[in-house]
């Protein structure tokens, strides 16, 4: 009974931290759109998208690799032994994203200022740090501390952003506030001081596989605004799509925080009972996500646009059909997230990567074949096609007998 209460309390703390994280994200976006307008906020939205990609490449996979490795080892020694390779990965990603932002600065941000690549590099480096800190806290069973880390990151951004906008209404200043979120990690300096055990260094291939897979997942879910800009969508349309995604990703953001509670138990379940023990949960997640996506489409078509305008201001909402399709895609993303965590817990690197490669290929095919829908319609159709394939492929991989 005491163990159940403790687990419920820890899950409740993670839920609260995830909700705070989501609300602070909304607050940051609303602060930007109301202060800078739809067009003024557009370059900040692009930096936000880079941060989402960084979280996909670094925060999520590092966090879950740390939790899984500590569950298998029973101590952080293996994580400490492989930390150098993980740091090189994080540094390479940060440098690569910064160079991309520098090379494509005018097309993405509207000018060639150094502010944008510096901010992009900063958010990427911070994403790696947060993955390590959150993973060590959760892997050590300190779920309440992990909840504070999850919720506090965007609270720091919101507070710093409000202070900087009080100094001057500049998109560059607001983008700089995004870099400050990982300062919350300073509350747990010992999370970065892991003791070596002298054992063999564990394989870090799962970090790369999960990083690639979750990057592809975030390209699908968060890549719409820059893709829309590349296809010729105006700044107002980019902000409208970003605002719709920001609203309907709320459950996804909450679920991201809760996944840290699931990885260790799922890992132990697979170790004790085999990968087949995940067959029923995988199929249930797939069926539920498809069914709920249909309901989300029907509700968001009429109700979504006025809600988006109320939250983020005039000119920030797409049409009803697009809004409904964005909502459906975000619900499908919840299912693909659940299946991704199951595949990570099972150590199924090949199936994990292949499921998301297939999803991106499906999205690209739909994007190429729907030219008559216009830029916004093509992007949203590709989102839904990719998520459907990701859900189906992930469930099929876990349902296959081994």
Region annotations inferred by a language model:
Residues 6-63, 208-235, 383:
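Signature of the first transmembrane helix
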Residues 38, 104-120, 235, 302-334:
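Interfacial segments at transmembrane-helix termini and the short loops linking adjacent helices
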Residues 114-121, 147-194, 358-362, 374-400:
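Hydrophobic alpha-helical transmembrane segments
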């Amino acid at each position: 009974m005491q163990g159940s209460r403790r687990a419920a309390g820890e899950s409740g703390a993670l839920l609260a931290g995830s909700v705070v994280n989501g609300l602070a994200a909304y607050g940051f976006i609303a602060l930007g759109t109301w202060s800078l307008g739809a067009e003024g906020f557009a370059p900040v939205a692009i930096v936000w998208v880079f941060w989402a990609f960084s979280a996909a490449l670094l925060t999520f996979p590092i966090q879950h690799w740390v939790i899984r490795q500590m569950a298998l080892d029973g101590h952080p020694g293996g994580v400490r032994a492989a930390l150098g390779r993980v740091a090189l990965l994080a540094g390479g990603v940060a440098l690569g994203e910064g160079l991309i932002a520098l090379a494509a600065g005018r097309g993405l941000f509207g000018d060639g200022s150094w502010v944008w690549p510096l901010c992009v590099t900063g958010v990427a480096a911070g994403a790696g740090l947060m993955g390590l800190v959150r993973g060590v806290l959760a892997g050590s069973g300190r779920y309440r501390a992990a909840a504070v880390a999850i919720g506090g990151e965007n609270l720091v951004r919101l507070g710093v952003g409000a202070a900087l906008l009080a100094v001057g209404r500049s998109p560059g200043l607001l983008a700089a506030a995004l870099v400050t979120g990982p300062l919350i990690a300073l509350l747990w300096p010992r999370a970065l001081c892991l003791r070596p055990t002298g054992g063999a260094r564990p394989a870090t291939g799962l970090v790369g596989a999960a990083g690639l897979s979750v990057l592809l997942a975030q390209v699908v879910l968060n890549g719409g605004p820059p893709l829309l800009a590349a296809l010729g969508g105006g700044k107002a349309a980019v902000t409208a799509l970003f605002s719709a995604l920001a609203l309907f990703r709320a459950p996804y953001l909450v679920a991201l925080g809760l996944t840290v509670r699931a990885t260790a138990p799922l890992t132990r379940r697979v170790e004790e009972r085999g990968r087949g023990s995940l067959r029923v949960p995988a199929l249930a997640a797939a069926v539920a996500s498809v069914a709920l996506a249909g309901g989300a489409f029907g509700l968001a078509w009429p109700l979504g646009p006025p809600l988006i305008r109320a939250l983020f201001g005039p000119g920030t909402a797409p049409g009803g059909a697009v809004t409904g399709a964005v909502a459906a895609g975000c619900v499908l993303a919840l299912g693909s997230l659940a299946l991704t965590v199951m595949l990570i817990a099972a150590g199924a690197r090949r199936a994990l990567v292949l499921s998301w490669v297939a999803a991106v290929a499906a999205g690209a095919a739909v994007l190429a074949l729907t030219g008559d829908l216009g830029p916004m319609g093509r992007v949203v159709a590709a989102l839904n096609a990719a998520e459907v394939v990701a859900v189906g492929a992930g469930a099929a991989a876990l349902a296959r007998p081994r």
